[in-house]
């Protein structure tokens, strides 16, 4: 866990975590307000789950396509003292030893993940970093996401209750707290292409507008982009006289091959209609605004976003 230089912060800073870097490229201009930047700095969350390798391959393919720097991030997520107090284990007597043991086991488990990451970035000739940090996974990933253009994470899914809670926290916290878009990869399926045929979910909201702006580098390189309005409201306070046509025209001015479409689906939820439409047109990526709110000190997804996260069949690009 050595370092090529210190542009990301000192190694002994617990908030920064340990990291290594190869062939560090010049920094690109970050987005300021609503302006658009290229996709040049990516983070992928990696762990010991079977789907970690799928996330890595998708992230590496996108990084290669866009000439992006790729950071692999592994979080050593161990419980704090409240976990032991709540479970009836005296923290002073046995909790510290147990935490230390868990920490050591997770650090050891990160080694094959790191080896896989290094093999893939070498194969794809990518500039890269490997990072490992300790803390709450969602908070740590969200913190480091602020220094990137896109974060690749996994869809929450694990039979272990604590693990699915942790994976949900990663997605929700990163999306709602980092100010950066998230690419969520489904827990099942193979995805040989991501971003060739993109389906944009359009409802004329600020979240959807932000998603289109954030995804512009991907949309520009797509072979086909379909902009879909579900159950559109016509008129100046809705989706316009021709639903989704205005945003499709805006995309065309950016060199995006976009077409407008709309569908009426009053018998199913909007999220389900979106996933069904994506399947019908063989889209390999969905771009959508991410909606969420606070509830009992927690960040939770809104209805459509929650449906997408629970039932996704293709990778989903979300912005908040």
Across the structure, where does each feature detected by a protein language model lie?
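Structural beta-alpha unit
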Residues: 2-37, 51, 77, 111, ...
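Small/aliphatic-rich secondary-structure junction motif
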Residues: 6-8, 13-97, 177, 190, ...
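A short acidic, glycine-rich active-site loop
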Residues: 94-111
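Hydrophobic alpha-helical segments and helix pairs
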Residues: 128-187
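Glycine-rich, Arg-bearing micro-motifs that act as flexible, cationic patches
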Residues: 153-173, 195, 288-310
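Short, flexible loop segments at boundaries between secondary-structure elements
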Residues: 313-320
């Amino acid at each position: 866990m050595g370092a090529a230089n210190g542009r990301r912060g000192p190694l002994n800073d617990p908030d920064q975590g340990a990291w290594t870097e190869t062939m560090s490229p010049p920094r690109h201009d970050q987005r300021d307000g609503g302006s658009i930047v290229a996709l040049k700095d990516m983070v992928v969350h990696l762990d010991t789950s079977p789907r970690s390798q799928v996330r890595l391959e998708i992230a590496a393919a996108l990084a290669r396509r866009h000439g992006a720097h790729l950071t692999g991030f592994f979080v050593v997520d161990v419980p704090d003292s409240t976990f032991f107090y709540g479970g009836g284990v005296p923290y002073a007597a046995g909790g510290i030893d147990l935490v230390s043991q868990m920490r050591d086991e997770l650090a050891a488990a990160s080694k094959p993940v790191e080896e896989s990451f290094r093999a893939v970035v070498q194969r794809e000739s990518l500039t890269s970093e490997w990072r490992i940090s300790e803390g709450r996974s969602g908070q740590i990933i969200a913190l480091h996401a602020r220094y990137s253009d896109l974060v690749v994470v996994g869809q929450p899914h694990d039979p272990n209750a604590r693990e699915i809670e942790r994976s949900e926290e990663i997605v929700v916290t990163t999306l709602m707290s980092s100010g950066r878009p998230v690419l969520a990869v489904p827990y099942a399926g193979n995805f040989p292409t991501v971003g060739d045929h993109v389906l944009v979910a359009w409802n004329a909201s600020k979240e959807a507008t932000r998603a289109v702006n954030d995804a512009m580098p991907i949309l520009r390189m797509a072979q086909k982009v379909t902009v879909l309005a579900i159950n559109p409201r016509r008129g100046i306070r809705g989706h316009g006289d021709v639903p989704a046509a205005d945003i499709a025209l805006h995309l065309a001015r950016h060199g995006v091959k976009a077409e407008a479409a709309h569908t009426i689906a009053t018998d199913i939820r909007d999220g389900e209609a979106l996933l069904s439409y994506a399947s019908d047109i063989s889209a390999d990526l969905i771009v959508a605004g991410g909606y969420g709110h606070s509830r009992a000190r927690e960040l939770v997804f809104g209805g459509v976003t929650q449906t997408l996260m629970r039932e996704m069949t293709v990778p989903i690009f979300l912005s908040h």
